[in-house]
Amino acid sequence: NPKLKVGMVGAHVAVDSYQSMKVGSAVDWVAGNEFDFTVKEVADGLPYENIDGLAWRRSNGEIVRNKSRAILENMDALPHVVDVYKRDLTIEDYFIGYLPHPYLSVYTGRGCKSRCTFCLWPQTIGGHVYRTRSVEHVVSEMAKAQQYFPQVREFFFDDDTFTDNLPRAVEIAKGLGKLGIKW
């Protein structure tokens, strides 16, 4: 279907968007680094040339790299992902062997101030500043998650460094305790 557009996100295309586009003509665009709002703008139908953080292919095959998208500072600007899960996913279809099934994965922050040489995420997507959602934003999402998915056996915070801000982690734990979520 020539009207179907194919896009890619992730660590590899964040590091080398041009080469990722160059290897084949099947990919129409790639979104680098934090791609949330870049992909939303693609889905909203904005012209590719107006979307920060996007590399894309013109109809003549030329690859264009737009300016980078700024790192998201206000993490509370992101919508609750559990609303998307409820709308689009059957969570029982997803399995990770080391987590009780079914589980639900949520990010409460991004980035990491450390500079570990073995870790690719801060270098490719999240950056070296740990930016977090507010305690209230996280706890309100977890309350929704309990309501939407009572069958969940484990909530998994997939942050790079959840305990980097220990007082915040303690406040989230207290909020989860008030919801009856075992910590």
Q: What residue spans do the PLM features occupy?
A:
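Radical SAM [4Fe-4S] cluster-binding motif and immediate context
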Residues: 80-183
